[in-house]
Amino acid sequence: MAKEELIQFEGLVTEILPDARYRVQLDTGHEIVAYTAGKMKKNRIKTLAGDRVTVEMSPYDLEKGRLIFRHKDERPGGPPRSGPPRGQFRRR
């Protein structure tokens, strides 16, 4: 199948299912089961419930899809800090 025939939708991951599959609520209101694309697996991009994602679907089977992109969080506080708090140790 040519890439031009694939349809892209945006949605929200509502549930994580076994075997690396996800239940996704599309912006159109439909609910589908999607799996992680190979490039996301290769780059170890983790997807959690509540994440906004882009799903690629075949026009012949509108019940299944492939997660191709996980959108970054739009949190007002910025990304969470990790590691020890600053100022605890002095660099030389």
Curated annotation (Swiss-Prot):
Disulfide bonds: none
Domain S1-like: 1-72
Keyword RNA-binding: yes
GO cellular component, one term: cytosol
Pfam families in the cross-refs: eIF-1a (PF01176)
Biological role: One of the essential components for the initiation of protein synthesis. Stabilizes the binding of IF-2 and IF-3 on the 30S subunit to which N-formylmethionyl-tRNA(fMet) subsequently binds. Helps modulate mRNA selection, yielding the 30S pre-initiation complex (PIC). Upon addition of the 50S ribosomal subunit IF-1, IF-2 and IF-3 are released leaving the mature 70S translation initiation complex.
Annotated family: Belongs to the IF-1 family.
Protein name per UniProt: Translation initiation factor IF-1
Gene name as annotated: infA
